[in-house]
Amino acid sequence: MSQPESLPFIADFPLKPHNTFGFDVRARLACRIETDAQLLAALRDPRAAGLRRLVLGGGSNVVLTGDFDGLVLLVALRGRKVVREDDEAWYVEAAAGENWHEFVSWTLAEGMPGLENLALIPGTVGAAPIQNIGAYGLEMCERFASLRAVELATGKLVELGAGACRFGYRDSFFKQEGRERFVIVSVTFRLPKVWAPRAGYTDIARQLAAVGLGDATPTPQAIFDAVVAVRRAKLPDPFVLGNAGSFFKNPVVESAQFDALAAKEPEIVSYRQADGRVKLAAGWLIDRCGWKGRTLGAAGVHERQALVLVNRGGASGTEVLALAKAIQQDVAQRFGVELEAEPVCL
């Protein structure tokens, strides 16, 4: 990495523009990170000594429940390139501050498909491994090669492979033991040269059929376009209505528990997993409990997608968490299923 350089710290920094819920909270200190050297300088600056650090990219997967008494690192690292290729795949590196959707679009434009099912997911490249983002039959970990990160406590640069990242369903090492310990600076993806479409989800298949591709093998661009169309139809724009996308993970239950649920609820939406367990559609469970479109204080459940909690104007992070807890209690009482929140709550 480059040698440290000085950079401005901003006191009493407003975080409302930097979280997609639009919570009106502030940080004690903040600085914008555009280079490796600036990151090192921020970590070593005596003004931030002893302060808690929070890394923000797009702010699309965080619930801020109050002012942050520490240093916020606004990651704006840019750059994307093919670092190598072999007979089987391209290896593409992107800096952590790159917009995720724009990166996916770029890989397609460069003739390197493989990420199209993850189009239009909000946030940055650096946030993708933390959450192990996924949608419509693909998880990021399936295209992951490695990442570079800086340890907050020491400023040491490390390179981590998939094993060290311990990816799970919307989970990783960075949400568990590694939480608040690292700043991801770049991610390298492995995009296979032998491509096969993943168009099995009903919404995607229906959208492809609507544009005359129901019986044809879709191209990567066609799947990209279908995913974008479906997401825009179902999910609110966070710049218009504050939200963090899907708020709850789809719960996975044992086969016996699913059979008992299906006997009582024959219309339950489910997806059989390779290990025999069954993934349930959290949105369906929430809708069945009557929460779709409801409001609690200034927080609410979106009218078209029950998985999405929204800020209807002036809501606090505490109000959103209170709404989430009420939903979790109702789902647990009716179905005996525990819903887990996707965003990081601070």
UniProtKB/Swiss-Prot annotation:
GO terms for biological process: cell division; cell wall organization; peptidoglycan biosynthetic process; regulation of cell shape. One of its GO terms (molecular function) is FAD binding. It is an enzyme of class 1 (oxidoreductase). The keyword Flavoprotein applies. The active site is at R170, S246, E342. PROSITE patterns: FAD_PCMH. It is found in: Cytoplasm. Its EC number is 1.3.1.98. Its main location: cytoplasm. NCBIfam families: murB, PRK00046.1, PRK13903.1. Belongs to the MurB family. Cell wall formation. This is UDP-N-acetylenolpyruvoylglucosamine reductase. It comes from Paraburkholderia phymatum (strain DSM 17167 / CIP 108236 / LMG 21445 / STM815). The lineage of its organism: Bacteria, Pseudomonadati, Pseudomonadota, Betaproteobacteria, Burkholderiales.
